[in-house]
Amino acid sequence: MPRTYIHVHSNPLPGKEAEYNSWYENVHLPELLEIEGVKAYQRFVLAPVQMNDKKQSHKYLIQLEIDSDDIPETISRMYAAHPTMRMKPVADFANLELSVVQVVTEEVRKT
């Protein structure tokens, strides 16, 4: 099975960016790592320079690496764990963008 990732695009609520970053790093992402099938995570923030002048819809991206042959089951575990997670009203949860992606081409580096 190809390597699989879940991408979560999100924004902090206005005036809550420091709390948002602290909550993600110290609470939410460690909770996600406890879910069977979630192997690793990385967080990204938009760089100050973009490819064009188009306004980006989300400032932050989380990439969760999934280590499972049953992706739907892992996603079900994530949703099932949600009620017990220590959620905090610091993110615009109503406008999250979620996607599941799989590797098509392994990393190729210039030599």
Predicted regions and their residues:
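Macromolecular interaction modules
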Residues: 1-111
